[in-house]
């Protein structure tokens, strides 16, 4: 297993977002704003779902990487650090998923 993490990818996204858009796909997405980045995230998510449904493990791995990358771009544009998402995941894992869902529905 590699030592590469989502935090590493977040740092790469942050660095590449500073480049001129004609030199970096990340910078181009960021320059296009949230609508463009979110649309691309949605496209990649659909491709991942299709790979999952068809049982294409190799393509699912590839598309999952695209989803994670594009999610980090969307978070970058929204100025939401990955740390915030991880804190929310940690909060949610402190209780069962069914209890967490029920608490959202009663709010």
From Swiss-Prot:
Encoding gene per record: hisE
Native source species: Rhizobium johnstonii (strain DSM 114642 / LMG 32736 / 3841) (Rhizobium leguminosarum bv. viciae)
GO biological process: L-histidine biosynthetic process
Family: Belongs to the PRA-PH family.
Chief site of localization: cytoplasm
InterPro entries associated with the record: HisE (IPR008179), PRib-ATP_PPHydrolase-like (IPR021130)
GO MF entries: ATP binding; phosphoribosyl-ATP diphosphatase activity
Protein's recorded name: Phosphoribosyl-ATP pyrophosphatase
Coiled coil location: none
EC numbers on record: 3.6.1.31
Catalyses which reaction(s): 1-(5-phospho-beta-D-ribosyl)-ATP + H2O = 1-(5-phospho-beta-D-ribosyl)-5'-AMP + diphosphate + H(+)
Location(s), subcellular: Cytoplasm
Keywords linked to the UniProt accession: Amino-acid biosynthesis, ATP-binding, Cytoplasm, Histidine biosynthesis, Hydrolase, Nucleotide-binding
Enzyme class per UniProt: hydrolase
An annotated GO cellular component: cytoplasm
Pathway the protein contributes to: Amino-acid biosynthesis; L-histidine biosynthesis; L-histidine from 5-phospho-alpha-D-ribose 1-diphosphate: step 2/9
């Amino acid at each position: 297993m590699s030592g590469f993490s989502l935090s590493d990818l977040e740092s790469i996204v942050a660095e590449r977002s500073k480049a001129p858009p004609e030199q970096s796909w990340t910078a181009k997405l960021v320059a296009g704003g949230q609508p463009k980045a979110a649309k691309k995230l949605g496209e990649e998510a659909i491709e991942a779902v299709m790979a999952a449904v068809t049982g294409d493990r190799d393509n699912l791995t590839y598309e999952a990487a695209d989803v994670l990358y594009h999610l980090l771009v969307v978070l970058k544009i929204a100025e939401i650090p990955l740390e915030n998402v991880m804190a929310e995941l940690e909060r949610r894992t402190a209780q069962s998923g069914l209890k967490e869902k029920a608490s959202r529905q009663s709010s």
